[in-house]
Amino acid sequence: MKISKILLSAMAAVAVFASCAEQEVTVSVVPQPASIKAAGSGVAIAPVPVIDCQSLELQVLGQTFVEVAGGIALPNFTLSIDPKLEKEEYTLDSRKGSVKIAGGSEAGVWWGLQTALQIIYQSEDTFPGLVISDKPAFAYRGAMFDCCRHFFTIDQVKEFIDMVNLHKVNVLHWHLTEDQGWRPEIKSLPRLTEIGSVRKETLVGHYGSNTYDGTPHGGFYTQEEMKDIVAYAAARQMTVIPEIEMPGHASAALTAYPELGCKGKGYYVQTTWGVFDEIFCAGNPGTLKFFKKVLDEICEIFPSEYIHIGGDEAPRAEWEKCPKCQALMKEMGYTSEAQLQSYIVNNIEKYLNEKGRKIIGWDEILEGGVTQSATVMSWRGTDGGIAAAKMGNDVIMSPTTYFYLDYYQTADPEANNEPLAIGGCLPLEKCYEFDPFDGLNADEQHHIKGIQANLWTEYIPTYEQVEHMELPRIAALAEISWSNASKPEYPVFVENIEKALLPIYTARGYNFSPYAFEK
């Protein structure tokens, strides 16, 4: 039974149309729906449209959509839940009367609304008559945002959420701790943000330049601010997964609490980039106590099923020399320092499991052995993910070769006036070539739970550059993670972006990269 209606004031309408008379679909959607057919006469885009909702929850969802739409003119909508559909599945029927969107849950309805938004931007005074049936290939469609190498405000994190959410991304992996800055407030460990959140200066130019700006850089997120981000994302059907690095990338934390390092002194918040020997002491009982304190508070803020525990780029040179670490190895019968990392990971996983949570870690966590319940995020190519899937572990594919969006976007960045980046060359077309199932048989493919694009910010000091590096490459992540085997050919995909997304990028003022569209 319909119990609520939303009356909306509207300001303006935009762009192209679909010819229903010919029953030909001439609108584009990214990612491309599983089924889209032209039918009926369509729905007028009204100055004062109505959103007819089946429940109060859908009424709130409709109000959020109006906010995200940003004041453009809209057609009438009818929103409902269809329990026969899968959670993120939706149908859209705009043959007459209203744009009727049914989802298997609020998430399904939301993705239907995002599809409708792209179509509205291609319409003039009528939303075309269409029948759409659609659902994602993968349940995890992620975007990682590093807010440690450079700090970004809460408002900018919200802008990031809206930007990737437009592409049906449903996970924000929030990278919160690093050598160059600790960002989350932990009330029981106040020095983490009092000391660890600020570095005295930042490298200028590429790694090895030995030139610094002489300006302190830092910032942190209060617990209330982080809860605000969680709520903001949830209203847009996104989950926020926090990352707390362990045992490496520890310089900022050890500057605040040096007694937790193997050396016990001499630490500082790093001012340059790279991998550092500073590491939490595996043989110090205080290390696990520290992480448990941190995670107690993190779990109160973030309700996500998963907590990311890092695990990448953890040099073991200090463990090799540390009497406490060597004593622990002898006690446990270990033959490799890699097992010390597994000791930390497995203890933390058990602790989080007791709280009803699961862990994700970068693929290095495989090196000393992991439990079957750990999810592996494969970043050093796909080999780690393939190995994990063959072992029966769940996997998120996030390879540098396809989805490290801090890489340059053209082969000649200087000639193309690209902003300074870490290196490499990752154009949109290369992203689009990724096959998440390559090297796996049908049974092993079931362990690939999703795909993620990562944005590391060593060379991204401004939010405008964040947009430039994400757009339009995040659309490739969206198309593969949503459509996968049914994705369109690359030229069609680019044309779809031009029709369906560029008008929205332009209207929102996004600083998108133009290279893929230059003829």
Each model region followed by its residue ranges:
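Acidic, contiguous N-terminal accessory segments
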Residues: 20-136, 141, 353-366, 370, ...
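Active-site neighborhood of glycoside hydrolase catalytic domains
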Residues: 253-259, 268-374, 379-390
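Feature activates predominantly on carbohydrate-active enzymes
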Residues: 23, 85-278, 282-306, 347, ...
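Active-site-proximal beta-strand/loop segments in catalytic clefts of secreted hydrolases
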Residues: 54, 103, 176, 243-245, ...
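Soluble non-cytosolic domains of exported or imported proteins
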Residues: 56-59, 107-110, 151-155, 220-224, ...
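Flexible, acidic glycine-rich loops studded with aromatic residues
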Residues: 358-364, 369-374, 380-519
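Flexible loop/turn segments at secondary-structure boundaries
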Residues: 151-153, 179-185, 247-253, 308, ...
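Bacterial Sec-dependent N-terminal signal peptides
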Residues: 1-27
